[in-house]
Every structure is written in structure tokens, then in C-alpha cells.
Curated annotation (Swiss-Prot):
Function: Dual specificity protein kinase which acts as an essential component of the MAP kinase signal transduction pathway. Binding of extracellular ligands such as growth factors, cytokines and hormones to their cell-surface receptors activates RAS and this initiates RAF1 activation. RAF1 then further activates the dual-specificity protein kinases MAP2K1/MEK1 and MAP2K2/MEK2.
Compartment(s): Cytoplasm, Cytoskeleton, Microtubule organizing center, Centrosome; Cytoplasm, Cytoskeleton, Microtubule organizing center, Spindle pole body; Cytoplasm; Nucleus
GO cellular component terms, A-Z: anchoring junction; centrosome; membrane; mitochondrion; nucleus; vesicle
Chain residue ranges for the region called Disordered: 1-27
Keywords assigned by UniProt, alphabetized: ATP-binding, Cytoplasm, Cytoskeleton, Kinase, Membrane, Nucleotide-binding, Nucleus, Phosphoprotein, Serine/threonine-protein kinase, Transferase, Tyrosine-protein kinase
GO biological process: MAPK cascade; neuron differentiation
Record PTM Phosphothreonine, positions in chain: 286, 292
Phosphoserine sites (modified residues): 218, 222, 298
Protein name (Swiss-Prot/TrEMBL): Dual specificity mitogen-activated protein kinase kinase 1
Annotated organism of origin: Pan troglodytes (Chimpanzee)
Entry membrane topology: Peripheral membrane protein
Family: Belongs to the protein kinase superfamily. STE Ser/Thr protein kinase family. MAP kinase kinase subfamily.
InterPro entries, per the entry: Kinase-like_dom_sf, MAP_kinase_kinase, Prot_kinase_dom, Protein_kinase_ATP_BS
GO molecular function, one term: MAP kinase kinase activity
Amino acid sequence: MPKKKPTPIQLNPAPDGSAVNGTSSAETNLEALQKKLEELELDEQQRKRLEAFLTQKQKVGELKDDDFEKISELGAGNGGVVFKVSHKPSGLVMARKLIHLEIKPAIRNQIIRELQVLHECNSPYIVGFYGAFYSDGEISICMEHMDGGSLDQVLKKAGRIPEQILGKVSIAVIKGLTYLREKHKIMHRDVQPSNILVNSRGEIKLCDFGVSGQLIDSMANSFVGTRSYMSPERFQGTHYSVQSDIWSMGLSPVEMAVGRYPIPSPDAKELELMFGCQVEGDAAETPPRPRTPGRPLSSYGMDSRPPMAIFELLDYIVNEPPPKLPSGVFSLEFQDFVNKCLIKNPAERADLKQLMVHAFIKRSDAEEVDFAGWLCSTIGLNQPSTPTHAAGV
């Protein structure tokens, strides 16, 4: 294909196949990418930011282990450790996820190949991807660094996250899931606060979605700790669909709104301790069966019970009523939004299109919220000199 103006983005694959850092054509025309961006109905700021990222990305070239300098550890989980790193040849700061896998070379190469679809995932609601490679028993996935970290980290500092902020988060998650489904036929498979990243510019982006079936299979044993966000139908072994992502998406704002993982549901006494007042509604009522003695390992906050075993948690999710937001504290629209996400039967659960026009989302979309300002003051980040409101969410 002859080069056209503007200058094309170079995504060069490694010659030996150990680092497949580019697309199959080895060269993607910026003009074609810009055309794809136009299809996404982005505002001017979002388009400029995506183009800036893609322009930076062409400086990267082939990714090699020796080219990285570790700055700090950002977190661990989902089968890997994530570091903030400097890519010395380009000067870019990235997030590098290292996944240690004892696998055969053919499987490893298949995983690297499958990860290449991430080069095509360019959206304001998806974390940017620089490339993936294998070195010394570890697969490295190199991504855009989000300086606000993940929402589970933010929640630990905030205690609880306000409804207005969660409205902006919900919009970004719906738009991110819609983009993955409509443009790439991808389901996320692991929506939870730790996989929603934020930054000081007010952007909210999804990461760690299931593009590589082989990687999911290879890491199957390491997913035990995140199963608490799985939908009832996943535990029952029925067909997985995007509706399962909706359940996880509904559970996440409940956790962030009340300040702890909401299964088992907090009782009236605990809610009173949380919110400093008597709370009305179903969430404050005694559950139909005695509450299990434990809590999930992923819980934090006021719940001091011993951890709930995974089989107890599975039984609770499948057989007990789904979590709800307490009324009297949150708006009716927010409560209804969550309820529609957390319907046990996936066929009755709201879909992405229905959620996008839900009253809570419409209201949140219209609200002026300084997400960047809230985030920076909450976690002690310096705000950029040109702060943005809600980052075009």
C-alpha cells in the first residue's frame, strides 16, 4: 500500500516472532486510523488525545526487555504484576504487566498473536496498548500508564465514591463495553473496580479484557480471587454472553458506593454505621436466610467477619437475592440502574443499549462533574495545567 499523508504509524513486528509488536501488515496508515476514529463520534478533545497517543506509539518500534527501566510497582493481581516503567528508546512512561507462565513455545506464541488485536482497540474508554512480547518465562503486556491507578485503589483512599462520580464511571464502562462488542466482537469477561483505570486528565478506561482465549485458559487457576464479580450464570456453567459483563458492571458501582464488596449484603446495623443514619429499603432488611459467617477475600471496609470461602460465595451469588443500593441515601435512578444490571436471569437483565438510555445515565451525562479535580484531591495527585471536566465522558 503506498504511503499517504499524514505520515503513517509504524507498528513493526519482530523478525524472530518472539515479540510480535505489530499488525499483520506491519504498517498501519494514520489516515485509515483517523477514519476509524471518525466513526467513533469522538469530541475534539478525545480525538486529539487518541491521535497524540497513536503518534507517540509510532516512536516505540520493537519492544525488548533491555529497553525498560523499572520505576515502581503499580499493583499485583489477575495473574500478574504491573510496573510503572520507562521505555528508554522513546522516553515514554508505560505500564508493563508481567505474567509468569510455564507454557510451551507454541502456546506462548499463540498468546502473543492473539494479543495483537489490542493494537486495533483505539477508544477513549479503552487503555492504550503499545505491544506484547515474551522474555525469560514471562509475557509482557505494555500499556498506557494511567496515573490515577485503578478504582479499587481509589476506593481504598476515598472510603466511598460519590454517586455523581459513579455516574461518569458507569457511562465510560458502558461505552467501553459497547465499543469492544460492536467494533471487535469482544466481551470483557472481568469487569471490576481493579480493571477500571483513571487519570489526572479525568479519563476513565477499561483494561484487562479477554482478547486472548489461550491466555484465559493458561491463567485459569489464577482467576479464583476475582470470581466474586462473576454472574450467577457463570457459576452455573451456562453460556457466557455480554450479559455476564452487565452483572459485573452493576456489582462494581454498588461496591464503590457503599465502600465494601456487597455480597453478602450489609444489614441495617452495618448500613447505619456506614452512613451515620438509619437507612430505608430492601438492602436494610434481614436477608431471607441467615447470613453466612464469612465475607469475600476481596472485601474491605467495615466488615470484620472472617473471609468467606469461595464455595460459600458461589452459593450466595446463585441462591440469594442480588445486592441492592440502600434507598434514602442514593437516588431512585441510581438504584434502578443497579437493579436492572443485577437481575439473575441474563435474558431479563438490561443490555448495553437499554442501559445507555437509562434515566441514571442520561442524568449523569448531562451533569457537569469535575472528575479530574475530585480524583486528584482524593488521592493526592497534581492536576494538569489544563484540567478537564468529566473528560468528555
